[in-house]
């Protein structure tokens, strides 16, 4: 463990939390890890967690699980392959964060996922009818496991108000205190335009 002389305004865990069960003997590795992180934050500091959603729509369509490469592995509790990591649903992740001592959480939904997002929705700004046309969905070198086209299903997911459950990944802002002021509710990176017209809003 590294000792720090000062506490931090922000700490980011980008693709980190899911591996904590692999490198510790703790009975509650994810909660214990976040408690340590919490102790490194200033009183008004924030923790940002980026992680895959084990129930992400791409996985229901047959895309390989990001950590094991085995389709449907995460939603099957990794019983089909070697458990290299542990991902969570929105409800599970929120519960872990709250049990770790964080008072406030705010969920963002990077699309197509947190690794290469072109659009970021939030719990205060969800897609209304269709997902944004700026979203660049992944193509897979080996598409033999795919059983459906992810991009064509989102309309029905949105219509039935289950987008937050099926979002491919989460970006979670965690705070020690409530009422953190104004938040960004929607962001888009328009990088498919001519270079002089590219922008982020």
Q: Across the structure, where does each feature detected by a protein language model lie?
A:
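Short conserved loop adjoining the S-adenosyl-L-methionine
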Residues: 2-6, 21
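A conserved beta-strand element that flanks and buttresses the S-adenosyl-L-methionine
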Residues: 12-15
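Short "lid" loop at the C-terminus of a central beta-strand within the Rossmann-like core
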Residues: 18, 52-57, 109-114
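A short glycine-rich, Lys/Arg-flanked "PGG" loop and its adjoining helix->strand segment in the class I
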Residues: 26-48
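Conserved class I S-adenosyl-L-methionine
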Residues: 46-73
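C-terminal alpha-helical "lid/dimerization" subdomain adjacent to the S-adenosyl-L-methionine
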Residues: 64-88
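Short alpha-helix
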Residues: 82-109
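C-terminal lobe and adjacent flexible extensions of AdoMet/dcAdoMet transferase-like proteins
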Residues: 111, 116-201
């Amino acid at each position: 463990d590294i000792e720090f002389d000062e506490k931090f305004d922000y700490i980011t865990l980008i693709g980190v939390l899911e591996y904590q069960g692999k490198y510790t003997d703790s009975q509650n590795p994810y909660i214990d890890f976040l408690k340590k992180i919490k102790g490194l934050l200033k009183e008004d500091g924030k923790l940002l967690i980026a992680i895959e959603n084990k129930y992400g729509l791409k996985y229901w369509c047959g895309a390989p699980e990001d950590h094991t490469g085995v389709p449907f592995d995460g939603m099957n509790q990794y019983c089909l392959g070697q458990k290299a990591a542990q991902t969570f649903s929105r409800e599970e992740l929120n519960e872990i964060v709250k049990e770790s001592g964080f008072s406030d959480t705010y969920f963002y939904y990077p699309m197509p996922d947190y690794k290469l997002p072109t659009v970021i929705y939030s719990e205060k700004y969800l897609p209304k009818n269709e997902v944004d046309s700026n979203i660049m969905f992944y193509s897979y070198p080996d598409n033999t496991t795919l059983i459906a086209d992810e991009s064509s299903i989102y309309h029905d997911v949105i219509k039935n108000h289950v987008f937050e459950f099926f979002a491919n990944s989460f970006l979670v802002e965690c705070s020690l205190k409530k009422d953190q002021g104004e938040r960004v509710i929607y962001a888009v990176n328009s990088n498919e335009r001519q270079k002089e017209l590219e922008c982020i809003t």
